[in-house]
């Protein structure tokens, strides 16, 4: 697939905007507690349900979505919680519900739970939830929980659900990309910014992997230039899983930028890889698990724990959703 210069500039700007949003979430990890937490009474809005816990006395906090590529169908939605003093709020799990805001009657359509996942390189982390959206448009997530001092808290925010995701949809055919392999370059540094790259992650192209009758894990990440600082740890997890599933699954790492040796500390010099554009990736890291038949099994935007990826790989090996 060929892209015009205009397409490349547009895509690059979109990527940098999204990464800036995620970097904003990361910055909360460096904030210190400077003021005491205060309790407020949440006033129900026209979009709130009368019996919602949001109408009880709770501390209102902020929720920051870390997932950008949301569309109808199955989604892995992640978010951070930020307290009134701008420090990250960390508890084991929170309750979530989702409302479709474009309906004539606003009501809870999906209820669930989100569990906390610590990021490996900071005091921040995200909450991970699974949700199936059946309608595109404006949705609201409401988060309720109890902090480590036993106090109730509440947060809500609106977000857009698209009719079609930027990245390949679940159960759709993935692009048969011909990414550069170790055999195509003179030095591994041309296709990997990892400090200690696992050479086995660079033996296959996506096209090769689709044609060898094994499931495939593809991680798009740029360890050296990652704005959220989670790309290196994510690639390391994929490498560790490669060892566990040796001979059962293909594993591939692809850089976000195609000229990693030319950037030299100036991200303005970075050129988005055409394969990143082909896959519609607008954040980093991004991990995909592909079935033997070349259809997408699952996808993971942002940092994903080893356990979560292990479970998904185990399911695809055993033909489970």
PLM regions and their residue ranges:
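N-terminal secretory signal peptides that target proteins for export/translocation
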Residues: 1-12
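Bacterial signal peptide processing site
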Residues: 32-35
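Contiguous segments within soluble domain cores/interaction surfaces
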Residues: 37-188
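Non-catalytic, surface beta->alpha helical segment in thiol-disulfide oxidoreductase systems
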Residues: 292-321
């Amino acid at each position: 697939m060929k892209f015009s210069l205009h397409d490349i500039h547009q895509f690059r700007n979109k990527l940098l905007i999204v990464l800036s949003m995620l970097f904003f979430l990361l910055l909360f990890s460096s904030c210190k507690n400077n003021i005491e937490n205060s309790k407020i009474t949440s006033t129900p809005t026209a979009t709130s349900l009368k019996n919602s816990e949001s109408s009880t006395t709770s501390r209102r906090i902020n929720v920051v979505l870390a997932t950008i590529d949301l569309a109808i169908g199955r989604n892995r939605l992640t978010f951070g919680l930020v307290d009134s003093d701008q420090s990250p709020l960390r508890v084991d799990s929170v309750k979530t519900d989702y409302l479709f805001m474009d309906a004539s009657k606003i009501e809870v359509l999906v209820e669930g739970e989100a569990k906390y996942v610590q990021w490996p390189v900071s005091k921040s982390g995200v909450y991970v939830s699974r949700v199936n959206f059946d309608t595109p448009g404006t949705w609201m997530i409401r988060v309720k929980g109890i902090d480590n001092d036993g106090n109730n808290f509440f947060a809500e925010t609106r977000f857009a659900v698209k009719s079609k995701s930027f990245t390949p949809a679940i159960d759709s055919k993935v692009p048969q990309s011909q990414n550069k392999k170790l055999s195509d370059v003179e030095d591994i540094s041309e296709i990997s910014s990892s400090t200690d790259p696992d050479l086995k992650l660079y033996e296959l192209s996506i096209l090769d992997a689709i044609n060898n009758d094994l499931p495939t894990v593809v991680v798009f990440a740029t360890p050296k230039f990652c704005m959220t600082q989670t790309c290196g740890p994510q690639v390391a997890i994929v490498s560790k899983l490669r060892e566990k599933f040796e001979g059962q699954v293909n594993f591939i790492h692809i850089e976000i930028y195609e000229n990693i040796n030319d950037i030299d500390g100036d991200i303005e010099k970075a050129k988005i890889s055409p394969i990143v554009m082909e896959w519609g990736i607008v954040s980093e890291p991004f991990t995909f698990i592909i079935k033997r038949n070349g259809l997408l099994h699952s996808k993971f935007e942002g940092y994903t724990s080893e356990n979560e990826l292990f479970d998904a790989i185990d399911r695809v090996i055993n033909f489970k959703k």
